[in-house]
Amino acid sequence: MTVVDIVKRTTSSPDDTALVKTLADAGYSTADVVALVAKTEGNGCVNDFSRTLADHTWDAVLPADAVTVFSGGTEGVLSPHASAFVGTDRPAAPEGALVAAVGRTASIPIADLGRAGQVRAVAARVRELCADAALEPGDVHLVLVKCPLLTTESISRCLADGVEPATRDTLRSMAMSRAASALGVAVALGEISEPDAAAALRGEADVWSSVASISSGAELDDCHILVLGNSPAAHGPLRAVHGVMRDAMDARTVLDLLDRVSADGGEVVQVLAKAEADPSGSIRGRRHTMLTDSDLSSTRHARAAVGGLLAGLVGDSAIYVSGGAEHQGPPGGGPVTVVYRVAS
């Protein structure tokens, strides 16, 4: 179990490491970082090399056992930024605190990506991390996963081995990898059963996790996992609450979370949310065009829409909004987690 604090800073480019100085100013160092979660200013799709640049830059700075989640796409009012989750033992509130557990899966075989093998790998690792942090499923407020995707090269290797990959479409592989990882989280936390997950992979079950936030990228071949939960046994500066937005306009869910933060005397530090274009093609009975825009991926539209809503409600544009919410909340919606600071 690691009690954590968050140090956040906006970035001027994907390779901006000014957060290192901000950490020092706050009395921390890079050695204290257990996870780095950032939004980079790329397109969030397969060829988003802003993630790769950020990953390459920070890999030389952070401890070897720290996990990184670089999510591309800062459309609309979203600000590129980085949040360092740091271990802390500073004096804190007397009861209950946010703790983190971080880890990685083994490399996901190309043939397993988007399939049951990936579900099992993520589920097993999430279970281990929850046990390490002494977190029950009800204590967990976010499971953030960065997972791999299929590239042209990896697809070719798979075919050369005589194995058909889950898809030959690199963009579709992003969604399939997110889906498998989300289902793994849901299985690990008892939100769904393994047969439910198998049915969902076949498109036969509409099941989802209320705390999974999954992003995929070409900069890794394993899954980086960050589990956040409130531990009644821990003392620390932060706590978290979470809810599930029913659609991209669901301000009520967010306002309810902010009311809970206020009732606890808290100050919002970070918001982490998933967003997607409603696959039905409509929102509350009105047609939307996010799925039929040939110029922009629907994930970019969704990030801009949900990012604007959340930034307006919270009063901060340096928030984490990730597009593509397959099995992460209901269709068209997505989980949202608010991390806040409490008085010591």
Swiss-Prot record:
It catalyses: cyanurate + H2O = 1-carboxybiuret + H(+). Residues 1-91 are annotated as: RU A. One of its GO terms (molecular function) is metal ion binding. The keyword Hydrolase applies. The keyword Metal-binding applies. Pathway: Xenobiotic degradation; atrazine degradation; biuret from cyanurate: step 1/1. Its EC number is 3.5.2.15. InterPro entries: AtzD/Barbiturase (IPR014086), AtzD/Barbiturase_RUA (IPR043008), AtzD/Barbiturase_RUB (IPR043006), AtzD/Barbiturase_RUC (IPR043007). The active site is at 146, 215 (nucleophile). One of its GO terms (biological process) is atrazine catabolic process. It comes from the Bacteria. Substrate binds at residues 51, 71-72, 178, 215-216, 303, 322-323. Residues 238-344 are annotated as: RU C. The record marks 299 as: Important for substrate specificity. Residues 97-232 are annotated as: RU B. It is an enzyme of class 3 (hydrolase). Mg(2+) binds at residues 276, 325, 328-330, 333. Inhibited by barbituric acid. Keywords: Hydrolase, Magnesium, Metal-binding. Responsible for the hydrolysis of cyanuric acid, an intermediate formed during catabolism of s-triazine based compounds in herbicides such as atrazine and polymers such as melamine. Catalyzes the hydrolytic opening of the s-triazine ring of cyanuric acid (2,4,6-trihydroxy-s-triazine) to yield carbon dioxide and carboxybiuret, which spontaneously decarboxylates to biuret. NCBIfam families: amido_AtzD_TrzD. Homotetramer. The monomer structure is formed from three repeating units (RUs) that share the same structure as one another. The monomer, the active site and substrate all possess threefold rotational symmetry, to the extent that the active site possesses three potential Ser-Lys catalytic dyads. It is possible that any or all of the three active-site serines may act as nucleophile (albeit only one can do so per catalytic cycle). Belongs to the cyclic amide hydrolase (CyAH) family. This is Cyanuric acid amidohydrolase.
